[in-house]
Design a protein with these regions (language model features):
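S-adenosyl-L-methionine
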Residues: 1-27, 37-44
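Conserved SAM/SAH-binding beta-strand->alpha-helix loop
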Residues: 57
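Conserved SAM-binding strand-loop segment of SAM-dependent methyltransferases
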Residues: 70-79
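A short acidic, Gly/Pro-enriched loop at the edge of an enzyme's catalytic core
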Residues: 80-92
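Conserved beta-strand signature within the Rossmann-like core of class I S-adenosyl-L-methionine
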Residues: 124-132
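Class I S-adenosyl-L-methionine
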Residues: 138-202
């Protein structure tokens, strides 16, 4: 499994990962983490959590992956090819403002993505998915109908999902990610949040 710290790429096997995670009960993963600012914020403000950021684009991660936090790890991997080393370890998953192939996978109910999330997770894991209007528009969906499509795909895959919640510009401005702030000050400062938990494997 490839990890990154600054500009250095490092291989981490199952045993090395187990050593890093030892002593942490709450292990969360941010999928499609972008520049890693959200992961850095959570790890710095929640020392009892272990926070993992995952993205395929290593260049964006150079800055935040440099931080010397023992409870933070960045992994280079695709959402459709999640590392098996993580199976059964994750208690909470976040997907913040996805676009491109990650958003497309959520919209189509991609089997590799949905099953991968389920296998990563411990019993009764929770998930937060935040969607923005601009990315959905680029994919050919309105915010409301795109959110409904993803909601239905998650329900069909065995997730219990609460009623979607609208995030306004103020909520986006105060959310600790670079992309949220860009959305807040952009031409379409709207987003939706889906929160739920897994009840069964798909």
């Amino acid at each position: 499994m490839e990890t990154i710290r600054g500009r250095k790429s490092l291989e981490l096997d199952f045993y090395g990962l187990a050593k890093r995670l030892s002593g942490y009960d709450h292990i969360m993963m941010d999928l499609g983490t972008g520049d890693g600012r959200y992961v850095h914020y959570l790890a710095e403000n929640n020392p009892g959590w272990f926070v993992i950021g995952m993205d395929l684009c290593r260049e964006n991660l150079h800055e935040h992956s440099r931080a010397k936090l023992q409870n933070m790890l960045f992994i280079i991997a695709s959402a459709q090819e999640l590392p098996r080393e993580l199976n059964g370890l994750i208690s909470h998953v976040t997907i913040n403002f996805p676009w491109g192939s990650l958003l497309e996978g959520l919209l189509t109910g991609d089997t590799k993505l949905i099953r991968g999330l389920a296998y990563l997770s411990r019993s009764a894991p929770s998930v937060d998915v935040r969607l923005n209007g601009g990315a959905l528009a680029e994919a050919g969906w309105a915010l409301e109908t795109g959110t409904e499509q993803i909601y239905n795909n998650m329900i069909g895959a065995g997730w219990h999902v609460n009623t979607p919640v609208m995030l306004n510009a103020h909520a986006l401005r105060t959310f600790p990610s670079t992309w949220a702030k860009r959305i807040a000050f952009g031409c379409d400062p709207r987003a939706m949040e889906l929160s739920g938990w897994l009840s069964s494997l798909p």
